[in-house]
């Protein structure tokens, strides 16, 4: 069996944003960086009509998705929020939604928290269900960076693709003649400017 090369196109991709909830804000390593990268990834996905799926871990106790991300939702793009108690995003409800509404889905792009718990378990479950999984390493985090780094390597060992937000953005557009290229360039420029203005937002170290 030939291992997937991990190529992605908008038509068969979806962005999964894992449990970026208000109660975690003061407990996650570089939480604001995770929010910032996820925000720009959402803007690109909205432009390319890549569906976005949020999960919320026990929102009754942990709060709902961080407001800055909810503001990025676009009525012209598909967005869905699933509540869960399972650590994995790959719940029966989510799988049924994918089978009914995204039958051509191949590539799952993941941002969120915590890398070594919900992101890791989601990745293993989605891989087991036959999806390619791409972890945006600069858009996932944990309570501490060591757990984050070990989890990234653990997911790589299991067959996930460890990548970055910017790399995914340019994979999705692929060609400078893409019809959305001129709309996406300012998004990537603003993202870079944010990282220069506030280096604390960067989670680039792996």
Swiss-Prot record:
CDD domains: YcaC_related. It holds the Pfam family Isochorismatase. InterPro entries: Isochorismatase-like_dom (IPR000868), Isochorismatase-like_sf (IPR036380), Isochorismatase_domain (IPR050993). Gene3D superfamilies: Isochorismatase-like (3.40.50.850). Belongs to the isochorismatase family. This is Isochorismatase family protein 1B.
